[in-house]
Amino acid sequence: MSQSPSVIDDILAEYQGLEMQLSDPELHNDPAAARKVGKRFSELQPIIQTHQKLEQAREDQEAASEMASEDKEFAEEAKRLEEEISELEEQLTDLLAPRDPHDGDDIVMEIKSGAGGEEAALFAGELARMYQRYAERHGFSTEILGLNETDLGGVKDMTLSIRSKQPSRDGAWSEFKFEGGVHRVQRIPVTESQGRIQTSAAGVLVYPEPDEVEDVHIDDKDIRVDVYRSSGKGGQGVNTTDSAVRITHLPTNIVVTCQKERSQIQNRARAMQVLAARLQQLKEEEAEAEAAEGRAAQIRTMDRSERIRTYNFPESRVSDHRIGYKANNLDSVLDGDLEALLAALKEADRARRLEAED
């Protein structure tokens, strides 16, 4: 399975051009431009590295084959290299395949408690901590933009920004894009005196936040801006002055909040960035109706009957209903150990995409 030389040559030329740009001190005077170039460089780097390994393996295999008739060890080496070449060709094919254009992007995640009252809010808080732990262990930075808590420390709603610390081919969107939907929990609530198992739900919405939000114009007449005092408790890393901002986009009824910054002006600017990202995603989904299915069909209702995943405490089981995934490691999952689950979701998505191409 060989790749078109012209495709590789074009990528190599672009890669070398980006490398030259990154070595230019002038570029780094513009952080946004430097980040854009760095991100594209990181997207191409695995392709170049895999191609170079493949070319070297082919050369080594050819040399070993020529010596195989004289030395048995070279025959074994030639066979091993054939297998390595096959693996590298498959890797290169995957790297060159069309990919989600947002995979390198940062994200904004909204977590809202649903059916289940205080217990649902406590569960929403556990989901938030789960995502924060996973993100921070995997080199992402997290920032709470908005937080509305209950008296018991549960989360009514939270807006969380998850960003790559360095430009990367695989950004936060590639990791978290399958988490949007309704998450259901089955357990005995701390608020339940009779010891009965109850079902509660929390909703998660994930959307990419590209470096550049294209073609999104927001008229001042289309938004309502409210200023309020945040409800974050001490230690939550959010501002508690009267500078928190809530922006409602009237045509779509989308609401975004930001209370992280110390000034109303800064919070408004950050909230407008988030709103632009939301509207960009909405525009893409309307232009491409199948996008919602392609992104694992995020469920925007809080109805606990429509769920993507169930967290069953009595049996310590996590079940993802979209792909039939089950694992009895609930405690570690809620502690942020999501590697196996996310890998299974990515592989199922890859299989669907390959099937669609056939």
From Swiss-Prot:
Keywords: Cytoplasm, Methylation, Protein biosynthesis
A GO CC term attached to the entry: cytoplasm
The keyword Iron-sulfur belongs to this UniProt entry's keyword annotation: no
Positions of region (Disordered): 51-79
A Pfam family matched in the record: RF-1
Residue numbers of N5-methylglutamine PTMs: Q236
Origin superkingdom: Bacteria
Compositionally skewed regions (Basic and acidic residues) per UniProt: 52-61, 69-79
Function noted in UniProt: Peptide chain release factor 1 directs the termination of translation in response to the peptide chain termination codons UAG and UAA.
HAMAP family on file: Rel_fac_1
Matches recorded under NCBIfam families: prfA, PRK00591.1
PANTHER family membership: LD18447P
Sequence similarity: Belongs to the prokaryotic/mitochondrial release factor family.
Descriptive protein name: Peptide chain release factor 1
Source species: Corynebacterium jeikeium (strain K411)
